[in-house]
Amino acid sequence: MSWQAYTDNLIGTGKVDKAVIYSRAGDAVWATSGGLSLQPNEIGEIVQGFDNPAGLQSNGLHIQGQKFMLLRADDRSIYGRHDAEGVVCVRTKQTVIIAHYPPTVQAGEATKIVEQLADYLIGVQY
């Protein structure tokens, strides 16, 4: 399966409206769906946040110029929320998956499908 198919499948669930897969270092976009693109400083703060969430804790995270309040940050997952919409960022061995969900979707529903994709990729050494 191509990387594009993974982001398209996330959108196809109806639980996510935008998704992007970056290299683990955040220096290359491998696939994007729904028009999600991040500025270099935005992906940079997310990639750094997996190892040291202090910056995200004090400043939030930014996706397409929008500030999201940090809900969770550890070495695998970063969750953020802005009003009723949110983002789920998950790091695997070789990728960073970032997905945005709209106000009509519950956070837990979006989180579950993104984390499941990450589990699959980790299981196949990605």
Swiss-Prot record:
Main location: cytoplasm
GO terms of molecular function: actin monomer binding; phosphatidylinositol-4,5-bisphosphate binding; proline-rich region binding; protein sequestering activity
Keyword terms of this UniProt record: Actin-binding, Cytoplasm, Cytoskeleton
PROSITE patterns the UniProt entry points to: PROFILIN (PS00414)
GO cellular component term, pick one: cytosol
Localization (cell): Cytoplasm, Cytoskeleton
Transmembrane stretches, start-end: none
One example of a Gene Ontology biological process annotation: intracellular transport
Xref: InterPro entries: PFN (IPR048278), PFN_euk (IPR005455), PFN_sf (IPR036140), Profilin_CS (IPR027310)
Family: Belongs to the profilin family.
Job description of the protein: Binds to actin and affects the structure of the cytoskeleton. At high concentrations, profilin prevents the polymerization of actin, whereas it enhances it at low concentrations. By binding to PIP2, it inhibits the formation of IP3 and DG.
Subunit structure: Occurs in many kinds of cells as a complex with monomeric actin in a 1:1 ratio.
The protein's name: Profilin
Taxonomic lineage from the root: Eukaryota, Fungi, Dikarya, Ascomycota, Saccharomycotina
Gene: PFY1
